[in-house]
Structure formats: C-alpha cells, structure tokens
Amino acid sequence: MPTLPMPTLPVHNVHRRRLPGDLDTVGALIEGLGGADDPIWPAHDWMPLWLDGPMALGTTGGHGPARYRIVSYQPRRLVRFRFHEPSFMIGFHEFSVEPDGPGHTVLQHALTMQLGPVGWPVFPVAFLALHNEVIEMGLDGAERRLTGRVRRPVTGSRLNAARRAVLGRYFEYTGAGPGARRPSTGPAAR
C-alpha cells in the first residue's frame, strides 16, 4: 500500500519597512543580527535571536523554540535561516533589503514555510501573533537606529505579553558554543 504524503499548511508572512538610507546603510543592520548590539531584534523584551558563530553560511542559531541554520547569505543584502526545529516548521525566515527610490531602502522580513499537522493549531494560536509583533518591533528598532525615532511604534498587546511569559518558561536560551554571538540583554545575558 503506498504511503500518502503528510498534508502541510503553507505560511507566507511578509513585513516591510521603508527606511531612509542606501542599500549598504540599511543592509548593515542585517549584519548585527544576533550580536551584542543587535539593531533589529528586540532582545530586551523577547527571547533573543542568537547565532553560534559569525554571520556566515552554515552558522546555526535560533530564538525561542526555533532552531535554524544560515543557508543563504549575501553581506548587507540577505540572510536566510532554514528551520530544523521544531520539526513541524519546514521552511525558512529571512531578512533582506531592496532599493526603494532615491535615498530609501526597504528592510523586509519574510517567513515562508509549510506547517506539518502538529503545527496547524500550534502556530496560528500560539506563535503567529507573537511573530508579527516581534518582527514589527524589530523594524521599529531598525528605524530608530537610522533616524533616532519611530514614526508609528508598535504597541505590544497584553495577550502577547502573557504568551511570552508562558512560553519563556519553556524556551529559555540554552546556550550555544563558545563562539556564540549572544545579545547583551534578555535571557541570554543572564
């Protein structure tokens, strides 16, 4: 009897922010991901994004329960992280930049994956709203880094704060190898 393929649920989630600056200026923010002075990821309020080495092909990292490896990297242009945990997330997330007229660049985050059956109820209920909030706060951080302010800052929801409190008990940063780029704030710094 033939084995039927496991059904999956596609997810494609994109966040974009038009920022002042050329490709190199805005693209430099990508280089700081997972570092001590990460200009994008809001590690002070969220489980930090960490990398187990330099920003390079093959470097592993994660945030919260997600674990991934850099599978595509173009300095100051693109970094793509392919998930390997949790197993129900099959795909990647990436940060990229593209020009948007004179003196402006779009910083984009894209999440493209297939959810296995276990992920169907888990991701939309427990993680999607958190994902949207952390990425928008990260884009706020990028805007603040470039301009000194944020025109329309994202306000975190109380429900997401409660979700983070519950999930934070289960998904602490467990440490990486000795060369890990650890954020200066958040659970990893403790």
Q: Where would I find each of the regions flagged by the language model?
A:
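Short beta-strand segments that buttress and anchor functional surface loops
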Residues: 54-62, 80-86
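Hydrophobic ligand-binding cavity/cleft-lining segments
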Residues: 1-51, 166-190
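Low-complexity, charge- and small-residue-enriched intrinsically disordered regions
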Residues: 56-59, 63, 128-139, 170-185
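A short, structured loop/turn motif at beta-sheet edges
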Residues: 20-24, 71-76, 96-106
